[in-house]
Regions:
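Catalytic strand-loop segment that frames the active site of acyl-thioester-processing enzymes
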Residues: 1-22
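Hydrophobic beta-strand-centered segment that forms part of the acyl-chain substrate-binding groove
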Residues: 38-70
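Active-site helix/loop of acyl-thioester processing domains in fatty-acid/polyketide metabolism
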Residues: 25-45
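Well-ordered beta-strand positions in beta-sheet-rich domains
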Residues: 8, 52, 99-103
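HotDog/MaoC-like acyl-thioester-processing domains
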Residues: 62-65, 70-127
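Residues at secondary-structure transition points
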Residues: 17-29, 48, 64
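Hydrophobic residues in beta-strands and at strand termini
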Residues: 9-11, 57, 106
Length: 127
């Protein structure tokens, strides 16, 4: 809420690369989601689509078994139709592993056809 978001992520074995650290693609997906969540936190009636994203990897995103990474997103600026964000992934020691900036376009949300059909979505925890 208020232009900020936080997501905790426990990488599964299939999300690790050959060096046994979280794959860069998994990190980029996490950053995309945490930045989009920050952008949407100021207007949950609108959806967002990614226009541009730049990622810098600073250190391996390694976790101990059962451990998790923490991603934090922040809305830096917005206009009526665009959101400018940043996000950082931290390891268990609180060290920054990856940082991204992203630009998102606000769009009208599509109707949730699954809900209309009575299908229940699993809840995603972002604690």
């Amino acid at each position: 809420a208020g232009g900020e978001s936080e997501i905790h992520y426990a990488p599964r074995p299939e999300h690790l690369n050959s060096f046994d650290v979280t794959h860069g693609g998994a990190c980029m997906t996490l950053l995309d989601v945490v930045m989009a969540t920050a952008a949407r936190s100021v207007n949950q009636d609108m959806g967002v689509v990614t226009i541009e994203m730049k990622t810098s990897f600073m250190r391996p995103a390694k976790v101990t078994p059962g451990g998790r990474l923490t991603a934090k997103g922040r809305l830096m600026h917005r206009t009526k139709s665009m959101a400018f964000t940043e996000g950082t992934i931290y390891d268990e020691a609180g060290l920054a592993c990856a940082h991204a900036t992203g630009t998102f376009k606000y769009v009208n949300r599509a109707p949730d056809r699954a809900t209309e059909a009575g299908i229940v979505h699993p809840q995603i925890s972002t604690d």
